[in-house]
Each structure stands twice: as structure tokens, then as C-alpha cells.
A protein has these predicted regions:
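N-terminal catalytic cores of NTP/NDP-binding nucleotidyl/phosphoryl-transfer enzymes
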Residues: 45-106, 208-216, 222
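A glycine- and small-aliphatic-rich helix-loop capping segment at beta-alpha/alpha-beta transitions
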Residues: 78, 112-113, 161
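Non-catalytic terminal extensions that flank enzyme cores
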Residues: 4-13, 17-66
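A charged helix-plus-loop insertion that forms the helical arch/lid used to bind
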Residues: 106-122
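Alpha-helical recognition segments enriched in aromatics with Gly/Pro capping
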Residues: 93-100, 125-140, 145-248
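Short, flexible loop segments at the rims of nucleotide/cofactor-binding pockets, characterized by
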Residues: 37-40, 70-71, 121
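A general structural detector for well-ordered alpha-helical segments in enzyme core domains, enriched
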Residues: 78-81, 124, 128
Length: 248
């Protein structure tokens, strides 16, 4: 099978994908400078520095929904950042959204995503992990599937989770507001997505969550849910969005 990170994107040099910083001892302040380089937003650098000073490996979450056969070009930026955390001794947690992929992330969408079957998602998930390990150190990566907890929830538990978030909060999302203003429908299951992504952070006790700038709202929901659960809130680290060669 072709390496999807190189032939599919011929303009991307192999050195950009495979060149990583050497694993060398760094002080918390040095780690902060190294890890925040190239990010679009970090909320907050002060909190990240405090976590780095704890002297333990941090749990760094990156979630991907296997909605297509290949990892999106834009994921490589977050994967590279996750690799940087690995090289400093932190725990990379690659969360495969095998459950949320059947819903579809509404972030940045002007219309509802078409639903995927579970079989389609599982086939895609297998290729996603293979491709991710072209960047990540497989031996130092923890892989989790959010279907492991969401499929165990009963309706009472789902209602309890939903009660922690208001409709007003959900409608603060720019993409939802834009669709309302344009008279386009928003399906109720789409409103669930940020809550579910946020709950993922509670389940894996994330110290930091990585994502694109389009994920900012969802990651902030995770902070709120962690606070309600009495957990330390995750640091938000979002990366600039890169378009693929097809412009998406």
C-alpha cells in the first residue's frame, strides 16, 4: 500500500514528516518554549508550565475520527506536535473516535455529515493507526477507542451528561450560529458531538488536548466537564489548520 503521507502529498518533504528533535533533557521552561512553538493558541501557557513542573509524564490527547480511508493532511501537524511531547517523555494518547465517527464532527461544516456504518468506521480506523505510526513512536503510544465507554452508557447516563451543558453554550459555536442564520437545519445528534469529545477527556484524564483551531470549542467543553468531575483541567493546544491538496 502506498504511504499516504508522502505520495498523496508530493509537495510535503519527507524531512518535514520524519525530522524530530532529539530526546534531550529539558527544563520545564525549555519544554514550554519548545512545545508551544508553531501553535495557534495555548490556553494557557501558565497552566502548561505548571503541569510540566509536576515532574511526571503528562497525558497528551489527540483525537481522530476515522471518517475516511486516509488520515487528513491537516492531522500531520497535530501528530508532529504529539511526537514532540513523546520525545520529552510524555504519554501520547491517540483516541480513535470509533463511536463519534458514526455521528460526524460538525466543526466547520455548513451541513450535516452523512452517517457512517460501524463497519466502515472500523476499516478506516485500521488505516488511521497504521498511518499515524509513520510519525508517532508506536511503542510509546496509548491507543483508546471512545466506543469502549459510550457503548456502555444507558439513556439515564446520557441525559445526565447532557444536563451539564446548555443549549446556549452549544449555540456559541460559530458554525452552528452560521447555519441557524442561513436557515439550515442542525440535527440534535450534532449538538452531542462537543459533549462527547469533552467526555473523552474525562475518561482518559487528559492533561493536554491537541487539535486544530476548528476544535477549540470542543476542547473547551472538555475543560468544563473535567472541572465538574473534580479533575485538573486540560491545557488547550490548537494548531493551525492545513488544507489538503484538494483544498479541504
Amino acid at each position: 500500500m502506498k504511504n499516504p503521507l508522502f505520495p498523496v502529498f508530493p509537495g510535503l518533504s519527507r524531512s518535514l514528516i520524519t525530522a524530530h528533535f532529539p530526546l534531550i533533557p529539558m527544563s520545564p521552561d525549555q519544554q514550554l518554549a519548545h512545545l508551544t512553538a508553531g501553535t495557534a493558541k495555548v490556553l494557557s501557557e501558565k497552566e502548561l508550565l505548571e503541569k510540566l513542573r509536576l515532574g511526571r509524564p503528562l497525558r497528551i490527547k489527540l483525537g481522530v475520527d476515522p471518517t475516511a480511508p486516509d488520515i487528513h493532511f491537516g492531522h500531520t501537524v497535530a501528530l508532529e506536535k504529539l511526537r514532540q511531547f513523546q520525545e520529552l517523555g510524555h504519554q501520547a494518547v491517540l483516541l480513535i473516535g470509533d463511536f463519534t465517527a458514526t455521528i460526524g464532527d460538525p466543526s466547520g461544516r455548513s451541513a450535516t455529515r452523512p452517517p457512517l456504518t460501524r463497519d466502515e468506521v472500523l476499516v478506516n480506523a485500521a488505516t488511521y493507526t497504521d498511518q499515524a505510526f509513520k510519525i508517532l513512536d508506536k511503542a510509546k503510544t496509548e491507543i483508546v477507542y471512545n466506543g469502549d465507554w459510550f457503548r456502555k452508557m444507558n439513556y439515564e447516563e446520557i441525559l445526565k451528561l447532557n444536563s451539564r451543558v446548555t443549549l446556549q453554550q452549544m449555540l456559541q459555536r460559530e458554525d452552528f450560529r452560521a447555519r441557524l442564520d442561513a436557515g439550515q437545519e442542525i440535527r440534535l445528534h450534532e449538538l452531542q458531538y462537543p459533549i462527547m469529545q469533552g467526555w473523552d477527556s474525562v475518561e482518559i484524564r487528559a492533561d493536554v488536548e491537541l487539535g486544530g483551531t476548528d476544535q477549540l470549542f470542543n476542547i473547551l467543553v472538555g475543560r468544563d466537564l473535567q472541572k465538574e468531575e473534580g479533575q485538573p483541567q486540560q491545557v488547550v493546544m490548537v494548531m493551525p489548520l492545513l488544507e489538503g491538496l484538494d483544498g479541504v
